[in-house]
């Protein structure tokens, strides 16, 4: 249920956006 940006990416508390590259695994939170 992510928008097309990393709005809900709070790795590892939340999963990464399924339709985007998992950049939140590198510490990105937006």
UniProtKB/Swiss-Prot annotation:
Record note on domains: The presence of a 'disulfide through disulfide knot' structurally defines this protein as a knottin.
Keyword Secreted in record: yes
Name of this chain's protein: U10-ctenitoxin-Co1b
UniProt keywords, alphabetically: Calcium channel impairing toxin, Disulfide bond, Ion channel impairing toxin, Knottin, Neurotoxin, Secreted, Toxin, Voltage-gated calcium channel impairing toxin
A Gene Ontology term for the protein's cellular component: extracellular region
Purpose of the protein: Antagonist of L-type calcium channels (Cav1/CACNA1).
Disulfide bonds: 2-17, 9-22
Family of this protein: Belongs to the neurotoxin 02 (plectoxin) family.
UniProt keyword annotation of Secreted present: yes
Subcellular location as annotated: Secreted
